[in-house]
Amino acid sequence: KDYKKIAKTRRQRGYQWEDTLVKRFNSLEGWKAFRLGSPSVALPDVLVVNNKKSVIFTIEAKSGTGTTLFVPYDQIERCQKWTNNFEVYKMRKVILAFKFLSKKRIGTGKYERRKLHEFYKVWGNKKKAVNCVCTYNGEMYESSNGKRKELRLNDLPMPFKSKYQIITK
């Protein structure tokens, strides 16, 4: 029963993060964002367009209370497929949006306070999709057979204001 409750809490956090991103984009002139559906469907979490600026983003959104957030390669691939199909847009980007919540899990049902962090990493349209991990400090790693290999992904300054966005060097 506890596992069902934990899974539900994680899903709710994910939906809230997606909803937050949609609201932030939709509050801006010229931007339109949409949540595209459930994880079982082969769709990105969020689709964002700006027709005047000829921009399309597909976003895979991850949030949590741990020290790392994981993105499976197939979720990156489905974002790439969508982004690459909309050739009419001059700027097409796959964005991995990470939100580390202000409470850090330190045990079952135990948390401690920390600063909320947000990272928006660009996954290249032609870059091969791999399982990857983002750390609380914004470092990216490829995760393969229990081994970590550094990944260099650029940060994308968002068109909306977020006092929690951190640009890594």
Where are these regions (language model features)?
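Short, charged, amphipathic alpha-helix that recurs within catalytic cores of restriction-modification
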Residues: 69-101, 106, 115
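Structural signal for conserved beta-strand scaffold positions within catalytic alpha/beta enzyme cores
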Residues: 35, 60, 96-98
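Conserved catalytic cores of phosphodiester-cleaving nucleases, focusing on short active-site segments
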Residues: 25, 46-48, 54-65
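Short, conserved, surface-exposed binding loops centered on an aromatic residue
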Residues: 24, 37-38, 49, 88
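Acidic-basic catalytic patches of nuclease active cores, encompassing PD-(D/E)XK
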Residues: 1-37
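Short acidic/glycine-enriched loop/turn segments that link adjacent beta-strands
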Residues: 40-43
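Acidic-residue sensor for enzyme active/binding pockets
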Residues: 18, 60, 75
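Domain-level recognition of nuclease-like catalytic cores that cleave nucleotide substrates
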Residues: 8-12, 93-169
